[in-house]
């Protein structure tokens, strides 16, 4: 897993616990001149012809300084530092890769009287170190949907995490794969009257997708774990061993993941 030293890593650590609040903010469509790139692909080119990517350029530099200071420079816990205030989102998970910071989030579309979550997709905010200091991000509103898994109901797109895998060749980004560990609701479990939550894993050659089911079935279901199987978080130890943590209110479990040169970290 590749990480970038310096400010982006510190920001990634802090952003992993950041809630993104829903005030309109200056926004313009990204152009070829201002769109950043990763692994040789300009973001606005919609890498690998992903029809779900919608691009918005976010510039909060005109906002009061307390709302656009880099993470960690605000005093007091009550000063806001939102990436965006017009997109209902939470459960941020950060990936520092190739000089860019990606903040993946869920997306809640519930109406005020719904009484629960209505989450069917995931998006991502992207910046680099200059953008981070200037308060400028590019927002990709929908990079993946829960129904990309044929076995899933298309709902329950809660907190997930993306992991970059260099396949043992850190100097060559063309070999890199990205794995997205996400909670979704499993059709079979729901039909059986069980808690429907399961963890799926998708893979892509780009952090923006398109994402496809990596194994064609749930990685974990509640019937296997005996707890609500949500909110996966991946950790790679210093020796290269990967652990997938997950859990629910008051309980957390972890499984040791296998590493395969062909399939990546998709089994345990």
Question: Model features per residue range: what roles?
Answer:
Residues 30-268:
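Carbohydrate-active catalytic/glycan-binding domains of CAZyme proteins
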Residues 1-28:
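Secretory targeting and sorting signals
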